[in-house]
């Protein structure tokens, strides 16, 4: 006998139907059903409801969804389901009977079924309205399920979709009303829209003014970069830019034609022109007659162009002595400010030197020194300012000479008896070191490495041969054969960059790489006024182009014989490039000898930071 025996009451049946209602509720919500144990009276044993889960699509498993805990066979039905089916049949037979007795458990079960089903439908409606989108202002539906018994159970469920459709229509109507009311609200503050428009116009005007200010600043920076680019400190002229080229040509004093045989990769560099030997045509416009070119500057510029004055120290000292002569000869009007008038005069004379040959970094630092001292003479008299500037320039020249003396002392201490010293090209400081070592009667051998087209090492050879030193003269391509015998390498410097890289005569990097390969110390001798804050990683961004005609000459040919490239300009596809400098990376440099001592190349930024006022004298 099943658990639904004689002792089962209507409470047992009501509890089981309530669980069935919960099951239907979870079924409609899409929640999986699990096996539940329903508790009855103490006299009856608990009954387990098997889980009923529909099999997935396409599956033929007949046992899918059956409870593994069910003790009944597949053909047997659950006693709870059989009891409920019997009660449903009794309800259908007694639909017309309105009498209800408390003893009749079937009628009470029917009422419980109707009430449970109404609760299920109301809960489903609440779940549907809870899934409404955010922002809907419709009120929650208040469905009052009828507690009166109906004739059949399906008659209670069809009422829900009608109520849902009515509530949805009400929601749509309310949303339409809200949408109609929304555009009417912003029409009230019309003045605010006008104020916003005026504010936007003001903002646009301010942005346009800011853009114009930026453009003006950039144009001023471009103008100032030409002057700053002269000293080699910050900006570099890009001659391949047509705008900058047009501005530079307007500012030029010497009118020289542009070179048509330039190499495309180096169009951004100033091209060499060999028209200075035929004379110089200086423009004499009316606004420029007030600031004439000094004769000493003209002669100095021509010497620069013909390379009669070469070397960073020689060029800087010659320029500073020419400035002293300008200060002595210039007389400003008494009602004019001396510093302003002299500044305009210096700019024009410096531009002439730039047109003759691009000035070196050491010359640029010297010009900055003079301009700094000139700015301190605003409150001085004309004579007092003149004397102060001449005295400052003489001190600067003495500083260069004292720096050379200090470098010579430090360099001689690194030369020992029996050393084999190698030097490349010609450096004034290295020459002084060798002469001092000879005076100290140190026994060493010197190797001079030279290269085309300048052959600067040959001039050094002629000057040192008279001192009785054993000298070996080789060309650059033979460095790898002679480097095995070398103990130290001494070279000069065109400039030392803030990242420790060296700019020197073209071919220096090859010598440094060979010295690194054979573990030979590579020592650089450089004054601190040649240091620059520029950072450069190659020799293409900044360089100078020499006379391409120098590459045509061949020393191996006999006198009177024609050169093989005598008419090279007639070949339109042939272009000659004569770069004057190259860059040696910091990894190949072992030591930099300065007037402050012997430093590693990594300490160059420290010198620029700590001794900037002493080296360059710029606030």
Curated annotation (Swiss-Prot):
Residues 42-56, 85-98, 136-199 have a biased composition (Low complexity). Pfam families: IF-2B. GO terms for molecular function: guanyl-nucleotide exchange factor activity; translation initiation factor activity. GO terms for biological process: cytoplasmic translational initiation; translational initiation. It is found in: Cytoplasm, Cytosol. Residues 21-251 are annotated as: Disordered. Residues 57-84, 99-125 have a biased composition (Polar residues). It comes from the Eukaryota. Its main location: cytoplasm. GO terms for cellular component: cytosol; eukaryotic translation initiation factor 2B complex. Keywords: Cytoplasm, Initiation factor, Protein biosynthesis. InterPro entries: IF-2B-related, IF_2B-like_C, NagB/RpiA_transferase-like. Residues 21-32, 200-244 have a biased composition (Basic and acidic residues). Belongs to the eIF-2B alpha/beta/delta subunits family. Component of the translation initiation factor 2B (eIF2B) complex which is a heterodecamer of two sets of five different subunits: alpha, beta, gamma, delta and epsilon. Subunits alpha, beta and delta comprise a regulatory subcomplex and subunits epsilon and gamma comprise a catalytic subcomplex. Within the complex, the hexameric regulatory complex resides at the center, with the two heterodimeric catalytic subcomplexes bound on opposite sides. Acts as a component of the translation initiation factor 2B (eIF2B) complex, which catalyzes the exchange of GDP for GTP on eukaryotic initiation factor 2 (eIF2) gamma subunit. Its guanine nucleotide exchange factor activity is repressed when bound to eIF2 complex phosphorylated on the alpha subunit, thereby limiting the amount of methionyl-initiator methionine tRNA available to the ribosome and consequently global translation is repressed. This is Translation initiation factor eIF2B subunit delta. It comes from Dictyostelium discoideum (Social amoeba). The lineage of its organism: Eukaryota, Amoebozoa, Evosea, Eumycetozoa, Dictyostelia. The gene is eif2b4.
């Amino acid at each position: 006998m099943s658990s639904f025996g004689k002792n089962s009451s209507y409470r047992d049946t009501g509890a089981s139907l309530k669980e069935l209602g919960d099951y239907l509720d979870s079924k409609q919500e899409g929640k999986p059903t699990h096996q539940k144990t329903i508790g009855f009276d103490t006299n009856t044993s608990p009954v387990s409801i098997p889980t009923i889960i529909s099999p997935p699509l396409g599956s033929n498993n007949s046992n899918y969804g059956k409870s593994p805990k069910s003790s009944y066979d597949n053909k047997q039905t659950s006693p709870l389901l059989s009891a409920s089916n019997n009660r449903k049949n009794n309800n259908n037979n007694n639909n017309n009977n309105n009498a209800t007795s408390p003893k009749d458990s079937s009628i009470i079960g029917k009422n419980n079924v109707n009430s449970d089903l109404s609760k299920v439908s109301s809960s489903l409606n609440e779940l549907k309205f809870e899934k409404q989108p955010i922002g809907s202002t419709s009120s929650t539906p208040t469905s009052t399920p009828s507690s009166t018994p109906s004739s059949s159970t399906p008659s209670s469920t069809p009422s829900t979709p009608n109520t849902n459709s009515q509530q949805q229509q009400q929601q749509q109507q309310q949303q339409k009303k809200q949408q109609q009311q929304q555009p009417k609200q912003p029409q009230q503050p019309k003045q605010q829209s006008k104020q916003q428009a005026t504010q936007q116009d003001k903002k646009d005007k301010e942005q346009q003014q800011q853009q114009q200010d930026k453009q003006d600043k950039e144009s001023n920076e471009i103008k100032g970069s030409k002057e700053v680019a002269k000293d080699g400190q910050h900006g570099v002229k890009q001659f391949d830019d047509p705008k900058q080229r047009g501005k530079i040509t307007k500012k030029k004093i010497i009118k020289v034609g542009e070179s048509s045989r330039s190499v495309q990769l180096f169009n951004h560099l100033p091209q060499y022109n060999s028209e200075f030997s035929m004379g110089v045509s200086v423009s004499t416009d009316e606004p420029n007659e007030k600031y004439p070119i000094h004769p000493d500057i003209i002669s100095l510029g021509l010497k620069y162009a013909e390379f009669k004055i070469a070397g960073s120290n020689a060029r800087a000292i010659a320029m500073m002595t020419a400035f002293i002569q300008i200060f002595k000869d210039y007389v400003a009007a008494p009602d004019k400010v001396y510093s302003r008038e002299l500044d305009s005069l210096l700019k024009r004379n410096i531009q002439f030197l730039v047109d003759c040959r691009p000035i070196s970094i050491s010359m640029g630092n010297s010009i900055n020194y003079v301009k700094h001292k000139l700015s301190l003479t605003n409150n001085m008299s004309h004579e007092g300012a003149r004397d102060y500037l001449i005295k400052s320039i003489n001190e600067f020249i003495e500083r260069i000479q004292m720096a050379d003396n200090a470098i010579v002392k430090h360099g001689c201490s690194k030369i020992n008896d029996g050393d084999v010293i190698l030097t490349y090209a010609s450096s004034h400081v290295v020459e002084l070191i060798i002469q001092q070592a000879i005076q100290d009667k140190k026994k060493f051998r010197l190797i001079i490495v030279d290269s085309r087209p300048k052959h600067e090492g040959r001039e050094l050879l002629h000057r040192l041969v008279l001192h009785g030193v054993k000298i070996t003269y080789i060309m650059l391509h033979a460095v790898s054969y002679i480097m095995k015998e070398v103990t130290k390498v001494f070279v000069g410097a065109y400039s030392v960059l803030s990242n420790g890289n060296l700019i020197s005569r073209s071919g220096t990097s090859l010598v440094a790489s060979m010295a690194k390969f054979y573990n030979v110390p590579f020592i650089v001798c450089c004054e601190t006024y040649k240091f620059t804050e520029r950072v450069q990683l190659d020799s293409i961004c900044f360089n100078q182009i020499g006379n391409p005609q120098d590459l045509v000459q061949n020393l191996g040919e006999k006198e009177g014989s024609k050169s093989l490239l005598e008419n090279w300009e007639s070949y339109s596809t042939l272009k000659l490039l004569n770069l004057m400098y190259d860059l040696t990376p910091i990894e190949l440099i072992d030591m930099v000898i300065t007037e402050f001592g012997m430093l590693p190349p990594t300490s160059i930024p420290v010198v620029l930071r700590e001794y900037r006022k002493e080296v360059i004298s710029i606030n």
